[in-house]
């Protein structure tokens, strides 16, 4: 498995989290721009729904970031395992060479 592909995927998750954050901030700024121009029961209902939506945005952003971090950690483990395998292969190669020398 290629750790670079895993890191690339992790970066895509981070970018998606940033897009979610930006989208939420845009919605907040547009709502703020309305100020007191929109009032009443419909506004109160909207505000309540919007608070729930913001919480969902925050949760989704957090999950994307956590997934990104987990993928990056997995990429590190992949590289560690590759290094361990390479080290073991080198030890096996040296052992074969030593056996070959002793067999002469």
Curated annotation (Swiss-Prot):
Where, if anywhere, are coiled coils annotated? 42-104
Q: Which SUPFAM superfamilies match?
A: EsxAB dimer-like
- The reply on keyword Coiled coil is yes
List, alphabetically, the InterPro entries matched.
ESAT-6-like_sf, T7SS_ESAT-6-like
Name by which UniProt lists this protein: Uncharacterized protein YfjA
**Organism listed in the record:** Bacillus subtilis (strain 168)
- Keywords tagged on the record: Coiled coil
Q: Which family does it belong to?
A: Belongs to the WXG100 family.
